Swiss-Prot record:
Gene name tied to this protein: rpsO
Biological function: One of the primary rRNA binding proteins, it binds directly to 16S rRNA where it helps nucleate assembly of the platform of the 30S subunit by binding and bridging several RNA helices of the 16S rRNA. Forms an intersubunit bridge (bridge B4) with the 23S rRNA of the 50S subunit in the ribosome.
Assembly behavior: Part of the 30S ribosomal subunit. Forms a bridge to the 50S subunit in the 70S ribosome, contacting the 23S rRNA.
SUPFAM superfamilies: S15/NS1 RNA-binding domain (SSF47060)
Lineage of the species this protein comes from: Bacteria, Pseudomonadati, Pseudomonadota, Gammaproteobacteria, Pasteurellales
Homology family: Belongs to the universal ribosomal protein uS15 family.
Keyword RNA-binding attributed: yes
Protein name as annotated: Small ribosomal subunit protein uS15
Source organism per UniProt: Pasteurella multocida (strain Pm70)
GO molecular-function terms, A-Z: rRNA binding; structural constituent of ribosome
Any Gene Ontology CC annotation: cytosolic small ribosomal subunit
Length: 89
């Protein structure tokens, strides 16, 4: 299940540069992190959902690529983003 519109708007407001900033790397990373966290709770109860697990791995890979890009282009924004999201790195 995807995120609700209100939850997405709250994430964009928190991580975006303005209210309509949906394309910046940090917003995309935050949205993917919220979806990944939601899917992890889904897999706690639905252990045999292998099709959904493939989608989860795809999201994790996409987030990793965005994090690598952000680290390469803006190191201080990268460190603040992973600290705010609670990601290890």
């Amino acid at each position: 299940m995807s995120l609700s519109t209100e939850k997405k708007a709250a994430i964009v407001a928190e991580f975006g540069r303005d209210a309509k900033d949906t394309g910046s790397s940090e917003v995309q990373i935050a949205l993917l992190t919220a979806q990944i966290n939601h899917l992890q709770s889904h897999f706690a109860t639905h252990k045999k959902d292998h099709h959904g697990r493939r989608g989860l791995l795809r999201m994790v890979s996409r987030r990793r690529k965005l994090l690598d890009y952000l680290k390469r282009t803006n190191l201080e924004l990268y460190t603040s983003t992973i600290a705010r999201l609670g990601l290890r790195r």
